[in-house]
């Protein structure tokens, strides 16, 4: 057999865990492919033995989504080459981390238009789920900014696909949760990168004003980055902060008064703060080092991410505030920011039926053994979101039954089932999501 096949306990234990540290399912074998042919062989091996196969990038899933209990884990770390960076595009392997993508593109004064907050995830990983970021109000998701993909389907066939060639596969794989094929290569869009970023961190005491200013910042398109965050102060009160950023290249500089004049914040905690663009997009790197040092990086992370209609978000936060803020601790927070639905084109990513929705991400760290309570809280939040027309962003630590998945995808379910039959006829891919196509 080609590629690298591991059956030792060290590799199997590692593949049976993820960043979430809530689910642990050790596989009997880990395959590290080096070529497309290795990927094809692993898939055919899996199908012939009636096993399942999960693709692993950096292992940043939160609820066992990259695990294969009793099956095969396909570790894509050797697919780590940035092949080409040219004007407006880059062609890269699926196992490349986004931090390495931007290192390559910034050397050509270009950048992906949408980046997630944490750049340690892989290209194939985020393109399989969506990929939200602070610039999604202008550019949609990372799945909306990919021009073509190279994929090995569940039946072991290698295909290149785009919006004009093999478009059914292209639409299925973008945000398809790994259900239809293994992304091995992607050609993504790039935009010109500015040199610097001016940051504005605006404080609010009123939730409605905080959310209204976010919608205003989204609509006027004056800012390149829009994200809100909620924390709990020492007295148990919610505190709101709107993080805005404007990209620029000296000698031209942002006009602070023009940018902020329409906003109704209480105070500005950080004003006229300029940083290098590369440092800004990789701003989580230092926090990761700190959390690794304290050990919290390795604790359970029962995260929940929900998409809530804009006209429901204020009431939702108010009525669920105790559930949202329980157990946030020192390193936890709630992210909340608006996104228009128009730029989102990947058909298998459910979004609310409205013009604008809010991403609401509850990012909690649990002491070992305390995650079960938070997972139960996540499930309740998911049900409450569903009741107001919201949907889950499917990277959650939320238990989902096969029936829940049918509800989650709604009218898309029949198309998803057809795509599963066509591209993964043996139903071997992505068992960690616990979907059923019987």
UniProtKB/Swiss-Prot annotation:
SUPFAM superfamilies: FAD-binding/transporter-associated domain-like (SSF56176), FAD-linked oxidases, C-terminal domain (SSF55103). The keyword Oxidoreductase applies. It holds the Pfam family FAD_binding_4. The modification Pros-8alpha-FAD histidine is found at residue 60. FAD binds at residues 55-61, 65, 117, 122, 128-132, 183, 393, 430-433. The FAS-operon encodes genes involved in cytokinin production and in host plant fasciation (leafy gall). Belongs to the oxygen-dependent FAD-linked oxidoreductase family. This is Uncharacterized oxidoreductase ORF5 in fasciation locus. It comes from Rhodococcoides fascians (Rhodococcus fascians). The lineage of its organism: Bacteria, Bacillati, Actinomycetota, Actinomycetes, Mycobacteriales. The gene is fas5.
């Amino acid at each position: 057999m080609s590629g690298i096949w591991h059956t030792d306990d060290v590799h199997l234990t590692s593949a049976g865990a993820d960043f979430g540290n809530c689910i642990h399912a050790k596989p009997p074998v880990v395959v590290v492919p080096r070529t497309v042919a290795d990927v094809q062989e692993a898939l055919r091996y899996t199908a012939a033995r009636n096993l399942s196969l999960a693709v692993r990038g950096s292992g940043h899933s939160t609820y066992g989504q990259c695990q294969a209990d009793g099956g095969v884990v396909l570790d894509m770390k050797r697919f780590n080459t940035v092949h080409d960076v040219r004007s407006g595009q880059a062609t890269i392997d699926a196992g490349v981390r986004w931090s390495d993508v931007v290192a390559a593109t910034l050397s050509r004064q270009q950048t992906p238009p949408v980046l997630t907050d944490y750049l340690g995830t892989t290209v194939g990983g985020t393109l399989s789920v969506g990929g939200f970021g602070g610039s999604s109000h202008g550019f949609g998701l990372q799945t909306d900014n990919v021009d073509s993909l190279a994929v090995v389907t569940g039946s072991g066939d290698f295909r290149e696909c785009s919006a004009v060639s093999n478009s059914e596969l292209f639409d299925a794989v973008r945000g398809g949760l790994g259900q239809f094929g293994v992304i091995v290569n992607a050609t993504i869009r790039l935009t010109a990168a500015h040199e610097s970023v001016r940051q504005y961190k605006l404080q609010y005491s009123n939730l409605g004003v905080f959310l209204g200013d976010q919608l205003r910042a989204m609509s006027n398109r004056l800012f390149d980055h829009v994200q809100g965050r909620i924390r709990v102060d020492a007295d148990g009160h919610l505190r709101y902060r709107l993080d805005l950023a404007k990209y620029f290249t000296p000698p031209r500089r942002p006009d602070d008064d023009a940018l902020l004049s329409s906003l109704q914040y209480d105070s500005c905690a950080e004003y006229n703060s300029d940083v290098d663009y590369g440092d800004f997009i990789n701003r989580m790197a230092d926090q990761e080092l700190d959390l690794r040092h304290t050990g919290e990086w390795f604790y359970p992370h029962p995260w929940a991410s929900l998409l809530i209609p804009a006209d429901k978000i204020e009431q939702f936060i108010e009525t669920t505030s105790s559930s949202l803020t329980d157990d946030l601790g020192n390193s936890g927070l709630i992210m909340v920011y608006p996104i228009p639905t128009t730029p989102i084109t990947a058909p298998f990513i459910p979004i609310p039926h409205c013009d604008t929705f809010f991403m609401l991400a509850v990012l909690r760290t649990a002491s070992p053994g305390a995650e079960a309570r938070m997972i139960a809280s996540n499930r309740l939040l998911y049900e409450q979101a569903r009741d107001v027309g919201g949907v889950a962003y499917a990277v959650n630590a939320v238990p989902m039954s096969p029936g829940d998945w049918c509800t989650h995808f709604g009218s898309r379910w029949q198309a998803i089932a057809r795509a599963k039959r066509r591209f993964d006829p043996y139903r071997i891919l992505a068992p960690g999501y616990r979907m059923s196509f019987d």
